[in-house]
Amino acid sequence: MSATAFTLEKIEPIERETIKRVAWRLIPLLMLGYFCAYLDRSNVGMAATTMVVDLHFSNAVFGFGAGLFFLGYFLFEIPSNLILNKIGARRWIARILITWGIIASLTGFVWSEWSFYWNRIFLGLAEAGFYPGVVLYMTWWFPSYYRTRFMSIFQSASVVSLFVGPPIGGLLLYMDGVAGLHGWQWLYIMEGLPPIIMCFVTYVLLTDRPKDAAWLTEEQRTWLQARLDSELEQRESIRKFSLGQAFLTPKMWLLTGAYFGQTSGGYGLTFFMPLIVKGLGVPTGWIGLVTALPFLCAFVAMIYWGWHSDRVGERMWHLVSSYALMAGGMAVCIVIGTGHPVITMVALCLAVAGNQCISPLFWSIPSAMLTGTAAAGGIAMINAIGNLGGWLGPSLYGVMKDATGSTDISLLCLAVLPVLGAISLMVAGHDPRQERMMRRG
């Protein structure tokens, strides 16, 4: 996270100093938690390169099992976010971190298809609520004008994890035979330790609400709360949703479909990227490093695109272009094939950049619509159902790969999904009054 990322426009000193202090206090802490979460996403693909051989898993078994994480995630997502809204982020996020850390480490001891399946379900149950909880938490601290840029910075932790995770995972695979364990077992055991540590850090350092922030001056607390209250009043004057209305309004379901299109294509690509890179003829020792390159490109793209969207006060076409880049990058991979590995890697960089740019922009739309309990439940609903795409994408890719033996056909199935997501997003639309509210700051 660079200093330039936190540079604020020419504004009143109280606003500039308050936002800067809140950002530097909260965002690094949340980023570390999200970094830990994404170690699983980055390393489950690395583990697959040897785990599937040692446990005699097919691509379909691995893809199905990897995606079962999102079944557990789906089942507990809404209750988890409602609990967070009730008891506070500090205690609940700390609980999430320690339980998923323990279960992530236990993945190193699965021995069969069914033990792998159940482990992934319980891991999803444990982690449920972290990401939508942070989306909700951002609305408690950041005015809408700043929210997308800081969501982009927060979410860049996932890209950093996907960038550094594969090389670290590749090194851990070389521990094969140490203490009688396979390399993939060491990979899973070690990835569970950081979230356990972060549990205690979060419990001590995270602050629930601005009124609890002893690290802000009285003047800063007063200004921030007044600004947030003013935005809440403006938003509710457009329309105030109850929890039930948030679950039933057609726009929320269209947004859920849009998010599903991104997650299904994105997770399918992420989980199987090490195997795609291996198919380009990359030596085993270099797979982790080469797999990390698209995420380095995505890191730069998502921070710039989130900042640009906030700066110009526009969401919809920033989002649609990101969906198009994601689908287009995969389409180029299909057309080029494995015969031109450099061009294929460039296309993968574009696809991953498009995928990673979507989420921080996307969440600005429901968080601008909803308030209070409706925000807690509605954001969790979109994330819970949308993230079932994390089950569909890897499963679809694995099944198609086993059935046809073709990477191109498998990628084609994934590329269609963000196209459908973009269509759903455009049908849902975005209230221009919320855009004007952002531009007024």
Where are each of the predicted segments found?
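Helix-to-loop junctions at the C-terminal end of transmembrane segments
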Residues: 76-88, 302-314, 401
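Extracytoplasmic gate region of multi-pass secondary transporters
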Residues: 44-45, 244-303, 359, 363, ...
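Cytoplasmic helix-loop-helix junction between adjacent transmembrane helices
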Residues: 119-156
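Paired small-residue
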Residues: 99, 103, 114-122, 343-350
